[in-house]
């Protein structure tokens, strides 16, 4: 099979919707230092006059259903995102659009449709592959299977294993091979081997996330045997297993919502923040006239980025995407999302919303069981702030997107002391302390936390006496807001 040398393997870019790229890497330089190739030798396709083919890889990570344009949080939204991708594809037909996971869960727009809207949008934008992230499991594997069937692209997760069979999960592919102008690009997907702990225990119980270095090594070799000229890893984790780097040419990370620009042994490892706030972009150039399968390192050491401001790089909404989104809004979303639930006298921070949540949890718990003495909620379950003024259910949904059920559980005094020292949002009844270690107490928390005790000693409680209220904190806060009308942030400092 014909093989090509990579003439400029690493011209690496990251796009930022706020026009600023923060990086401590000394290898990140300004766009004026981009290596210049004449138009007679660089092309998006192979021709006699243009032996150099450029492949542009664009990756979106941790989108979390941020389909609505939200300039205050630098969220570009799907209409403008589609416009940007369409422009890039017109500029270079060899552009490839990818995702390193956590695409569906996180907004009313996406959650109401269980990710269906985001999948349809990705189909319309022409995504080629997506790694499975931990939050793709939030609605159990039922929706992984449903969204896999709906997707025009594969969901990748080479190290997601079904416990019962020790085989890769049926909804997860190991890789995909993509061809552009005679260049074969192998795409492999992984998820961090420790990320089961970030998922509701019952939702991920049938699966294990195993270490993936050897799996990637073998899959990379298989793809190269099939003719791959380039191997790209989509990795849903903030770090990549070090043993993987000899077997891939570029890595797109996710999960930690950081903006990262660095390299390992000359190979790019990128992450583009979250919510569409940044887009990672890596460019490779191939010399199709060279038949020798060699990897030519870029001796100049020039790495570059371009800042893509939402004001001047995303000026137009894509009309086709707007039509898709508007249809969803009218038919399924607006009636729920736009319900006004009250007022915020001041803006509420995530910390204040967390305290508001445990305040309401304790009040609600005592209507179910009057001797509940404390409430607990994790900080990671509060995902956004709420602005001053009129508050809609959609805003509350974005702050509390997870469908975690409120659980009332019995604990010993010793176990209660563990909860009190766990660093959670918490509220207790007056005069709870000193805690009697030999006495029994009742507390309320969310099942994301209580289910952790099924597999570990953390979040201890009596499993046999637990009471599931089948209520979500989001719904309880909505009811509270509707009842009180106005919520004051200062009440929850």
Residue ranges of model-derived segments:
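Positively charged n-region of N-terminal signal peptides that target proteins for export
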Residues: 1-4, 18
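Small/flexible residues
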Residues: 4-5, 182, 385, 490
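Bacterial N-terminal signal peptides
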Residues: 7-16
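Bacterial Sec-dependent N-terminal signal peptides
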Residues: 16-48
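Glycine-centered small-residue hotspots that permit tight backbone geometry or close packing
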Residues: 18-19, 101, 189, 431
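Acidic, metal/ion-coordinating pockets
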Residues: 37, 44-306, 352-363, 372-377, ...
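Catalytic centers of hydrolytic enzymes
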Residues: 53-56, 60, 65-71, 82-84, ...
């Amino acid at each position: 099979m014909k093989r090509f040398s990579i003439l400029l393997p690493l011209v690496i870019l990251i796009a930022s919707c706020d026009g600023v790229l923060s990086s401590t890497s000394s290898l990140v330089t300004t766009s004026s230092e981009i290596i210049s190739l004449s138009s007679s030798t660089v092309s998006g396709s192979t021709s006699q006059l243009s032996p150099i083919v450029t492949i542009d890889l664009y990756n979106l990570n941790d989108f979390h259903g941020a389909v609505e344009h939200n300039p205050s949080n630098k969220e570009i939204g799907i209409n403008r995102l589609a416009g940007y991708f369409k422009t890039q594809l017109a500029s270079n037909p060899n552009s490839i659009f990818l995702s390193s996971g956590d695409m569906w869960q996180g907004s009313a727009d996406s959650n109401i449709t269980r990710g269906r809207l985001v999948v349809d949008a990705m189909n319309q934008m022409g995504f080629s592959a997506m790694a499975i992230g931990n939050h793709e499991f939030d609605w159990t594997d039922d929706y992984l299977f449903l969204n896999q069937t709906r997707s025009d692209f594969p969901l990748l997760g080479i190290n997601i294993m079904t416990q019962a069979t020790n085989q890769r999960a049926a909804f997860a592919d190991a890789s995909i091979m993509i061809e552009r102008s005679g260049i074969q690009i192998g795409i492999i997907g992984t998820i961090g081997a420790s990320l089961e702990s970030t998922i509701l225990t019952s939702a991920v119980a049938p699966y294990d996330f195993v270490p993936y270095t050897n799996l990637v090594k073998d899959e990379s070799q298989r793809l190269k045997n099939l003719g791959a000229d380039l191997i790209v890893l989509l990795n849903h984790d903030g770090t990549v297993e070090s043993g993987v780097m000899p077997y891939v040419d570029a890595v797109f990370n996710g999960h930690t919502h950081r903006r990262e620009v660095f390299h390992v042994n000359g190979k790019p490892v990128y992450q583009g923040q979250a919510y569409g706030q940044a887009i990672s972009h890596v460019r490779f150039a191939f010399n199709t006239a060279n038949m020798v399968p060699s990897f030519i390192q870029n001796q100049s050491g020039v790495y570059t980025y371009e800042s893509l401001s939402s004001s001047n790089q995303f000026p137009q909404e894509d009309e086709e995407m707007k039509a898709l989104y508007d249809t969803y809004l009218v038919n399924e979303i607006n009636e729920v999302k736009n319900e006004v639930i009250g007022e915020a006298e001041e803006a509420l921070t995530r910390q204040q919303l967390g305290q508001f949540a445990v305040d309401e949890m304790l009040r609600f718990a005592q209507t179910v069981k009057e001797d509940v003495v404390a409430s607990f909620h994790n900080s990671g379950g509060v995902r956004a702030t709420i602005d001053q003024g009129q508050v809609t259910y959609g805003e509350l949904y974005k702050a509390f997107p997870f469908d975690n059920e409120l659980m009332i559980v019995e604990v010993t005094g010793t176990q209660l002391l563990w909860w009190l020292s766990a660093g959670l949002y918490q509220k207790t009844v007056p005069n709870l302390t000193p805690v009697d270690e030999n006495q029994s107490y009742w507390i309320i928390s969310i099942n994301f936390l209580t289910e952790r005790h099924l597999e570990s000693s953390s979040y201890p409680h009596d499993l046999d006496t637990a009471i599931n209220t089948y209520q979500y904190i989001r719904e309880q806060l909505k009811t509270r807001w509707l009842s009180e009308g106005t919520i004051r942030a200062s009440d929850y400092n």
